[in-house]
A protein has these predicted regions:
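Acidic, low-complexity intrinsically disordered tails
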Residues: 298-299
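Charge-dense polyanion-binding interfaces
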Residues: 111-153
Length: 299
């Protein structure tokens, strides 16, 4: 059986720390503790170890970080400019604390994914690229034509009934000349995508333009993933931003069982491959052990 009692954060789903420890310490059991991490950088390692070693109900372990020195920082505010480059994981103990952050990120034109959904409609991105393919003389399949026609106004951009695309098969490709000559397209091939796809919302057009100016690669999934800590277990990223805000209910749970919350934040800290940014809370309610540890080290 493979398991890590320090990351058993799904107690409500049957991840029983006591059961795992009991099985590991049963007479005749052979324990093999992995002594080398190939993810956790040296700068994060002492903070993670210091946190989890406060738990009494655990299997003692000694393990080494990877060769990467890495970086750990303790900013006093959520600096969204950090997201300009690199692969990121934004983590918080609850979705509630991520909602406002996601709203701020959208307002600043930051491209991210959360729960499998992108902050910008994939349809909008695909339509923009499809129009550019037409401009470059490439052919589009039926599903691509339907997509751009969805964002083009009838009468001004398309002849009446053009969206029916009568007689077109799924495997057929259509060029700009085909669409203009046989399928009711009225727009010039020189028309910029944002003018051609005039039914796309202004917000999405602005965001796509902003991302293109920043040289964001929209042909790939977002570099930034937003998740609760529980949702990110098993994941990793080069850079992790960890929000330490907790709810009032979370604070009550911490007073009842601090070891459970330490496991949660230990799991979050150990997602980072290069950098960990532990952000100060916006309210007075926080899981403060990591930042308190940092303050002690600075004295």
């Amino acid at each position: 059986i493979a398991g890590d009692d320090d990351q058993a954060i799904y107690q409500w789903a049957g991840a029983d720390v006591n059961a795992l420890l009991s099985r590991a310490n049963r007479e005749g059991s052979i324990k093999d503790v992995l002594k080398q991490s190939y993810r956790i950088p040296a700068s994060v390692h002492p903070y993670a170890i210091s946190l989890i070693n406060r738990n009494k109900n655990r299997e003692p372990k000694i393990w080494n970080p990877c060769k990467e020195k890495g970086l750990i920082k303790f900013p006093n505010y959520k600096d969204l400019s950090l997201f300009k480059e690199g692969q990121w994981l934004l983590l918080a103990p609850t979705g509630y604390h991520l909602d406002k952050m996601c709203s701020d990120m959208r307002n600043q034109g930051i491209y991210f994914k959360r729960k499998g959904f992108f902050s910008l409609s994939q349809e909008s991105i695909d339509a923009m690229f499809a129009w550019e393919k037409l401009q470059q003389g490439e052919g589009l399949f039926l599903n691509e034509v339907k997509l751009i026609y969805k964002y083009i106004s009838s009468k001004t951009g398309l002849k009446w009934g053009a969206k029916k695309l009568l007689g077109v098969t799924e495997n057929e490709t259509l060029t700009y000349e085909d669409l203009k000559g046989q399928h009711g397209l009225l727009i010039s091939a020189e028309t910029p995508w944002h003018a051609a796809l005039d039914r796309m919302s202004e917000r999405e057009q602005r965001m796509i333009n902003s991302l293109l100016k920043k040289k964001e690669n929209l042909k790939k999934p977002p570099r930034i993933t937003v998740s609760t800590i529980h949702g990110a277990k098993g994941g990793e990223a080069d850079k992790v931003m960890l929000l330490t805000d907790i709810s009032r209910k979370g604070l009550e749970e911490y007073y009842k069982n601090s070891e459970e919350m330490r496991r949660v934040f230990y799991t979050a800290m150990t997602r980072a491959k290069q950098e960990l940014h532990v952000v100060a809370p916006e309210t007075e309610i926080e899981f403060g052990e990591i930042r308190y540890d940092h303050q002690k080290r600075q004295r």
